[in-house]
Amino acid sequence: MAYQKVECQFNGQTLTLETGKMARQADGAVVVSFGGTKVLCTAVSAKQMREGQSFFPLTVNYQEKFYAGGKIPGSFFRRERGATERETLVCRLIDRPLRPLFPKGYMFETQIMPTVISVDEQNDPDTLAMVGASAAIAVSDIPFDGPVAAVRVGRVEGNLIANPTIEQRAESDMDIIVSGSRDAIIMVEGETRFISEQEMLDALFFAHEAIQPLIDVQLELVKIAGKEKREFSVPEIDPAVVEKVAELAETRLSEAVKIRTKQDRYAAVAEIKTEILETLAADFEDQEDDISEAFGNLQKRLVRQMVARDKVRIDGRDKNTIRPITCEIGLLPRAHGSALFTRGETQALVAAALGTSKDEQRMDNVQSMEFKKFMLHYNFPPFCVGETSMRLFPGRREIGHGMLAERSIAQVLPNHDDFPYTLRVVSDILESNGSSSMASVCGASLALMDAGVPVSEAVAGIAMGLIKEGDDIVVLSDILGDEDHLGDMDFKVTGTREGITALQMDIKIKGVSKEIMQQALEQAREGRLHILDKMAEAITAPRSDLSPYAPRITTIQVKPDQVRTVIGPGGKNVRGIIEATGCAIDIEDDGRINIASADGDACKAAIKMIRNLTQEAVVGKLYMATVKKIMEFGAFVEIFPGTEGLVHISELAKERVKKVTDILQEGDQVLVKCLDIDRQGKIKLSRKEALGQSLPEEG
């Protein structure tokens, strides 16, 4: 394969696609470069399909090499470990727009591997990996209805920006990744700070316009370096099987799919399917897979026709109606906050825990190292759908759903300086029939308010769907699991009464117009407000106090140059305070000190010890001092821990003193008065001026 290179101008910089130099034995390999960031993207697809394969085994493995940023991994073996949370999330971003563009019936094992091999401090490699992955498939012989491209959209001072730099992202009120083809938006993922539905719509179509040059440059590369696409055959279902299944099952199945409860509906459908398989086994020997596929296709067609044409949903609702909602809080007495959110047959048990800076999660990646102060973890155990399976670790779906909920809630959390807690929220899905991630958002909002976390507003989430049959189009609010599986769009929107905080969208078909998206966003807003009203019946504002089991964090401020004094040599002073009081103490370089303890008295004791270490002498004030060292010319005394001053021999008594030891001995307690503090900070003290006086009583 000859080396080929194409370029385009994007956002004031040059984006480059190269092929034919690296990874030449892959079916497709492209290096995408932008600024100092480079991503090597490879695509390989098996030449033979596994026997009995019934789904498309696509795997995306995105990896950030630490050498790309001139770093060495911090792990014990100094190697990159398994996929980080960030890498897992980027894998999903790449997978979701690519998967629907492979031909129907293509079930050959396919692996996409974007590898970050160089990274600068301004250009995030995630959207570049999305472009490079599409380009690698496009130039390969793998069948593909692409290319697609992706951009990140930010907004600074009201101006939309495509692929903002990391500096610009820090100032932006939105962070959205949009992926699309030449004609349509396919995938959206991101977070915003309370923007309106119209502003969101404008951002989406701004992004679609921005990706066009990235589509063009891929097509240019395909033109000069693309391979001829391989041919493959799709096994077709025997038409006789399709006809017989419809004849035997259509009437009964039409009624079964209208059963409103999920388990009863599934049982009825399974019973019909079993009977059909048994009935047709003799006439269509060894065609069980065809019979099952024909039955599934029939079920899909019946449900879609029922919703799109008859305007009747599986559970009897109209397109706008939200399932019945119940909200309970404070169920778990020892969790710092808890909620049980139930919407129809979807239920989330959500708990919140408050911790200190020691509980922050260290996030070490190729571009930076951060400490995460808010985490939301989503768990989807098999029992929530009445199944069994081995679960050891959260899967990609669970990590993705948890991050969507985390982004949704993060916008309403208090500033860390005002509320210096580390927060962890866990959502355990107890029942699932669609929209479990949105139930997690609602439950998390309730649990945090129950915990007394001063969130600015409640947050709710809703999943929207779309079914398009010819000219019949229906946008559905609060979709069921079957409506998600059998529909054409999954559009999750979260937000407050003020605006949108996060969204996630996957579109499976072409031709979803701006008007349809506008309708979906408006319908989602109406649904979100309804859900917020239901949540307000349980709690309207954060509790005024934290759980008695939560740590109390008190923040005090000392001068930055006093931090060393508080810490002490080798950490001696701060360790002593921790051992004496049992408090957790976190000291910032700017002099901010957080003291955490569930015991209020212990916290007060720690504060007093720190104040003793950092207090400064005041001219004219009396101190009870300890004699530390006797000299011929006077005595050095400690007026408080770490601070000493000199009592000159002439200041020991009103009469003349010949020897210091006539008045003082080392270890004596003596009342002194501060006379002066010179420019070097030396403290001049007097015993003579303190005679006849006493310390004021502590109030």
Curated annotation (Swiss-Prot):
What is the E.C. number? 2.7.7.8
Required cofactor(s): Mg(2+)
GO molecular function annotations of the record: 3'-5'-RNA exonuclease activity; magnesium ion binding; polyribonucleotide nucleotidyltransferase activity; RNA binding
Statement: the UniProt record of this protein carries the keyword Secreted: no
Q: Does the keyword Magnesium apply?
A: yes
Q: Which UniProt keywords apply?
A: Cytoplasm, Magnesium, Metal-binding, Nucleotidyltransferase, RNA-binding, Transferase
**InterPro entries for the chain:** ExoRNase_PH_dom1, ExoRNase_PH_dom2, ExoRNase_PH_dom2_sf, KH_dom, KH_dom_type_1, KH_dom_type_1_sf, NA-bd_OB-fold, PNPase
- The S1 motif domain covers 620-688
Q: Which Pfam families match?
A: KH_1, PNPase, RNase_PH, RNase_PH_C, S1
Q: Which reaction does it catalyse?
A: RNA(n+1) + phosphate = RNA(n) + a ribonucleoside 5'-diphosphate
CDD domains the record matches:
KH-I_PNPase, RNase_PH_PNPase_1, RNase_PH_PNPase_2, S1_PNPase
Q: Which GO terms describe its biological process?
A: mRNA catabolic process; RNA processing
Q: What does this chain do? A: Involved in mRNA degradation. Catalyzes the phosphorolysis of single-stranded polyribonucleotides processively in the 3'- to 5'-direction.
According to its UniProt record, which protein family does this protein belong to?
Belongs to the polyribonucleotide nucleotidyltransferase family.
Please give the HAMAP family that the UniProt record associates with this protein. PNPase
Name of the molecule in the record: Polyribonucleotide nucleotidyltransferase
Q: Which organism is it from?
A: Syntrophotalea carbinolica (strain DSM 2380 / NBRC 103641 / GraBd1) (Pelobacter carbinolicus)
Name of the coding gene? pnp
